Amino acid sequence: MSRLLHAEEWAEVKELGDHHRHPQPHHVPPLTPQPPATLQARDLPVYPAELSLLDSTDPRAWLTPTLQGLCTARAAQYLLHSPELGASEAAAPRDEADSQGELVRRSGCGGLSKSPGPVKVREQLCKLKGGVVVDELGCSRQRAPSSKQVNGVQKQRRLAANARERRRMHGLNHAFDQLRNVIPSFNNDKKLSKYETLQMAQIYINALSELLQTPNVGEQPPPPTASCKNDHHHLRTASSYEGGAGASAVAGAQPAPGGGPRPTPPGPCRTRFSGPASSGGYSVQLDALHFPAFEDRALTAMMAQKDLSPSLPGGILQPVQEDNSKTSPRSHRSDGEFSPHSHYSDSDEAS
């Protein structure tokens, strides 16, 4: 550790200087200031007094009173209050002062050294100022946590967006899996891609819609049964007799009470005669077993109107008169058409 110079040591240094300067009494050493009064008290170190003892070649020489114009107050405050320089930086000037005293004792020419240039002084000053600025920037970074908060908010938003996208993709994949299970895969072990799945679904939907629009595509209509053929044959025969009965009705025949349009026989067989059933008629299915006596019954009903239709030949009227007592009335039909109950007797109809 360095130590301060005593007054006795300063006296010795002064005597050595006077001895060397005796041939030139008019010459005054530039850097031999008198020790301040504060140095006499050994236990009271003062930084400005110590700085005045530094050599002009030392980088800290710009803090001497000769260079007080270059931010002396800031630099002195930095040296006095810096915690990092309390032990190391403060000890360096003392060591250098001791070495300077020894050099003065040996040679006595320490005052003739060259002073540092202004460029070097400015460089040292910039270094010190740069250190202060760096420290201030570090403090400002620590005091401004807003950037960290902003980064935290952005990170949370990014994580939330990633979670939403992950859920959306999971739902989309689940929907495609269900669609693959519905559409026909034709025993294909390979898993269809999303594009192929959509194409197959489109084709499948179009095929189903066409099938609904044309339900009987590729099916031949069933052939008509034998009963339907017999029905058409006998209905054509009845229509011919119906034309003759209509002519007689125009000549002056009055329709029997309860007459009405012919009932439409229900069933799988379709005919060209369609109309609502009368109140007195019965809607029954036509059967081929009823039609063998159809022509005789129709002829008998027509011949019963011999008085109303004199145009008919007389030879045909005799069998009609003989068989008239055995036949039942025409079930109140006036159009000469076959009635389903024409084969019943009067007793059956009355009951």
UniProtKB/Swiss-Prot annotation:
Region of interest (Disordered), residue spans: 16-39, 89-116, 244-278, 308-351
Family annotation (Pfam families): HLH
Tissue: Developing nervous system, and in adult epithelial cells of the gastrointestinal tract.
Protein name (Swiss-Prot/TrEMBL): Transcription factor Atoh1
GO BP terms, alphabetized: auditory receptor cell fate determination; auditory receptor cell fate specification; axon guidance; brain development; cell differentiation; central nervous system neuron differentiation; cerebral cortex development; epithelial cell apoptotic process
Gene name per UniProt: Atoh1
GO molecular function, one term: chromatin DNA binding
Subunit (UniProt): Efficient DNA binding requires dimerization with another bHLH protein.
PANTHER family tied to this protein: BASIC HELIX-LOOP-HELIX PROTEIN NEUROGENIN-RELATED, TRANSCRIPTION FACTOR ATOH1
Residue spans of biased composition, Low complexity class: 247-256
InterPro entries: ATOH1_bHLH, bHLH_dom, bHLH_transcription_factors, HLH_DNA-bd_sf
CC terms in the record's Gene Ontology section: nucleus
Positions of the bHLH domain: 156-208
Keywords: Activator, Developmental protein, Differentiation, DNA-binding, Neurogenesis, Nucleus, Transcription, Transcription regulation
Organism: Mus musculus
Record keyword Ubl conjugation present: no
